[in-house]
Swiss-Prot record:
The active site is at D74 (proton acceptor). Coiled coil: none annotated. This is NAD kinase. Keywords: ATP-binding, Cytoplasm, Kinase, NAD, NADP, Nucleotide-binding, Transferase. GO terms for biological process: NAD metabolic process; NADP biosynthetic process. GO terms for cellular component: cytoplasm. Its EC number is 2.7.1.23.
């Protein structure tokens, strides 16, 4: 059995401030109050929800054996992940979203599933993030991290954009398309999947590049080594600014002639699951795959 947690930090995004999330947060506070654990909340959570728990500044998180409990959907966990990797604190999710690939625990199972986790009965896996940078010869303009994907999009353009893709300083191809999705295995069941990308097991050390509506019949998703360094050279022929987004949260302008570098972040997200969690069960359930049990 692993070490018990000493502190629980509750996290919910402001725009998810609805009755369902509020109910689960208060249910968590009531349950955690019966456990031998200190209860805190993140400052963003405190701004939108009235919980009987003190705010723990982010710079003080991770100082003890902390667990970050996210209430919301996968988007909420994506947001919390960028905070969690900076303090090396593990994360577990209560699903109040739609699909819930990352948020395992159902609201009605909070007590039965979270109790054993608090006492050290859980599975832990590491998920890597992508780090991206927008730059040119003179300056660096933006840096961000993504657990799911980094997306180059056409912004306000209504026609195809042009860019070159280099991997480890070697030219791969010139693209004319709506953009490019660069996804981790974690993100392979998100935006990349809807664009025709493959599903990758989350423990694979790989990155997938998925062109979006490419003007070429031979353009296909490309799975590469997770240690590779990727560069997108934005063609000067583009008539307007493009955009780069990280997990759909952070979005920045990319100008013609600039470059976008993408590589693995040195930190890992520590994602926890109840002991009865199985990845392929999640795929089958969330994607509606059929199952046939032999009698």
């Amino acid at each position: 059995m692993k070490r018990k947690f000493k502190r629980a930090i509750l996290y919910a995004r402001q725009h998810r401030a609805n009755q369902e999330v509020n109910e689960s947060l208060h249910r968590l506070v009531d349950f955690l109050s019966t456990q031998d654990i200190e209860i805190f909340q993140d400052s963003d959570t405190a701004a939108s929800f009235e919980l009987k728990a003190p705010v723990l500044p982010r710079e003080k998180m991770g100082a003890k054996h902390d667990l970050i409990i996210v209430v919301g959907g996968d988007g909420s966990l994506l947001s919390a992940s960028r905070m969690a990797i900076k303090v090396n604190a593990p994360v577990i999710g209560i699903n109040r979203g739609r699909l819930g690939f990352l948020t395992d625990i159902l609201p009605q199972d909070i007590e039965s599933h979270l109790g054993p986790v608090l006492n050290g009965q859980y599975n832990e896996e590491e998920r890597f993030l992508l780090h991206t940078k927008i730059y040119d010869k003179e300056n660096s303009y933006f840096e961000g991290d993504a657990l799911n994907d980094v997306v180059l999009g056409r912004g306000s353009e209504t026609h195809l954009i042009e860019f070159d893709v280099y991997i480890n300083q070697q030219l791969v191809s010139h693209y004319r398309s709506d953009g490019m999705i660069l996804s981790t295995p974690t993100g392979s069941t998100a935006y990349a999947l809807s664009a025709g990308g493959p599903i990758m097991h989350p423990q694979l050390n790989a990155i997938v590049l998925v062109p979006m509506f490419s003007h070429s019949l031979s353009s296909r998703p490309l799975v590469i080594d997770g240690e590779a360094e990727i560069e997108l050279y934005i063609s000067k022929s583009n008539e307007t600014d493009l955009r780069i987004s990280c997990d759909g949260h952070e979005s920045r302008v990319v100008k013609p002639g600039q470059k976008v570098a993408v590589k693995k972040n040195g930190n890992r997200l520590r994602l926890l699951h109840p002991l009865d969690y199985h990845y392929y069960d999640t795929l089958r359930s969330k994607l509606g795959w059929e199952s046939k049990h032999q009698g």
